[in-house]
Amino acid sequence: MKNNFITTALLVTFTVCVPTAIAQQWQDVPAYAKSQTKNVLDRSIFYVPLFGSVYRAKFEVLMKKLPGIRGVVIHNHGCAGMWGWETTVAQFYYREGFAVVTPEFVTRDGNKLGCPGGTSEEMLKRAGERANEGVYTAKNPARLSARGDDNQEVIRWLKTMTDLPIFLSGHSEGCRTTYNWNRTEPQVKGGICHKQSVNRLYEHLWKWDTRLPMWSSNEDEDPWAGGSKQFPAVGFEEKFKDNPQNLTSFRFAGNSHDPLVRPGEVQSLRDWLSKQVSAPPIKSQNGFNYEDALQNIQNELKNNVK
């Protein structure tokens, strides 16, 4: 009961203390400069089917040599940066046969978290403060545009290796990064939004082309998505009213912000991915001998020595 009271109080703080006009202003800081994309790959973790988490040189070689990769997912973390739940999501994708890149945005020079704190209650409270300030918050269009710049640079790099379909994924603030995407990039084939809404305080951020398919998940009373018993988290149905066939929405009557934890949630996303990509997940080596790739990786590592 006490925890429910705290959550409700913090939700009120988070939603009421944020004037819409301030939130919609573009507020730039050096951390959002486009020049900071130059080290995005140094701020990223990479995953490959069968292998899991790998370093960059190994990723680059296996993208060209490992047969059967279904596509590439760029997964964008939430307001707290790269934590365990983001890794859990990335692991789901690679086990489904996708290569994955997870850029960490908050480690750009001079950047800050959108929700600092040592407990979930403190983080939610301080997320409201950051939103009220209007700079280091997902409500700031400049922040999401900068995250889009990071994604664009990752895509540019990926295109030097593969023409596989690319999917933009995100959790929480990373979901807002995904639905803020409006750049012409034919290789991007869809979006995936974990546990985030598009309520009125965030509508100014929506730029997604609804001709592209999207999978989304939301819990009715998730405080991080602005949800409560009286006012459930707002899904994307209204945004997709002209193309409803392109939205797959997973809803749950709960209050968790954690991705891929509810019955049926994993299967829903798995089914959606299979509709987008006809190739099946990689279940075995299929004759691939890792030793055949070693020389290429060794050469990459030699070339990378400064």
For each predicted feature, which ranges?
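Bacterial N-terminal signal peptides
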Residues: 8-17
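Sec/Tat signal peptide C-region and signal peptidase I cleavage site
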Residues: 18-23
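N-terminal cap/lid segment of alpha/beta-hydrolase-fold proteins
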Residues: 24-66
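Serine-hydrolase catalytic machinery in alpha/beta-hydrolase-like enzymes
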Residues: 50-63, 69-160
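Glycine-rich His-Gly loop
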Residues: 75-79, 172, 219
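Primarily recognizes the serine-hydrolase "nucleophile elbow" in alpha/beta-hydrolase
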Residues: 149-210
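The feature captures the conserved acid-bearing segment of alpha/beta-hydrolase catalytic domains
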Residues: 190-257
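C-terminal catalytic histidine-bearing segment of alpha/beta-hydrolase fold enzymes
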Residues: 241-306
